[in-house]
Amino acid sequence: MSAANMPTTTGAQGSGNQVPTTSTTIVNHFRELIKDPKNLDEASKYLFQTLLDDAVVGIFNETHHLRKSGNLAALDGVPEDSTYRMCEMPNLDIFGISTAKKPMDCTCPNCDRLVAAARFAPHLEKCMGMGRISSRIASRRLATKEGASSAHLHSAGNAGGTDDEDDVDWSSDKRRKKSNQNSRNNGSKKNNGKTF
């Protein structure tokens, strides 16, 4: 058999009007060539040419598809040198990100003020009136309101209040005096002015 009689794939001889062969046709034709020991050289050339043509056509088809779909640049990849350059500018780390601390501000939902993040919790506590001092002020207001209402009841002749209400007022005055004495010592409790 000569090379002109052999079936080829579309790219084997370079002409576009040849009929593409299937793998079963290629295998069957190769088996026929192997039956005769004189044709082994021709069979090996045929097999090599068929495999080479198949690989080349596959690469051409894949490249054409990538070019038409716009993905051909993805084969080139990204140049490695530019991505791994270190930044040597002041106030930037090696990746070019700023190392300076940025002040974080929060907006108070109650009064719509900008407050530093570190001061947001204490501000919100005072702003909403929920802090320790605010609760003390609120309890004093309640005590004065109850005292005023009980005085009003006493003046009307109704004795609805109890003696415990008077005790609360008396004990709170005592606490104030004690706290004033502690503040005179300037917070020092070591020796209370005594020398050893």
Swiss-Prot record:
InterPro entries: SAGA_su_Sgf11, SGF11. Belongs to the SGF11 family. A zinc finger (SGF11-type) spans 106-127. It is found in: Nucleus, Nucleoplasm; Cytoplasm. One of its GO terms (biological process) is protein transport. Residues 180-196 have a biased composition (Low complexity). Gene3D superfamilies: Classic Zinc Finger (3.30.160.60). Component of some SAGA transcription coactivator-HAT complexes, at least composed of Ada2b, not/nonstop, Pcaf/Gcn5, Sgf11 and Spt3. Within the SAGA complex, Sgf11, e(y)2, and not/nonstop form an additional subcomplex of SAGA called the DUB module (deubiquitination module). Interacts directly with not/nonstop. Interacts with the AMEX complex component xmas-2. Interacts with Cbp80; important for promoter recruitment of Sgf11 that is not associated with the DUB module. Component of the transcription regulatory histone acetylation (HAT) complex SAGA, a multiprotein complex that activates transcription by remodeling chromatin and mediating histone acetylation and deubiquitination. Within the SAGA complex, participates in a subcomplex that specifically deubiquitinates histone H2B. The SAGA complex is recruited to specific gene promoters by activators, where it is required for transcription. Required for nuclear receptor-mediated transactivation. Binds independently on SAGA to promoters in an RNA-dependent manner. This is SAGA-associated factor 11 homolog. The gene is Sgf11. The long N-terminal helix forms part of the 'assembly lobe' of the SAGA deubiquitination module. Its main location: nucleus.
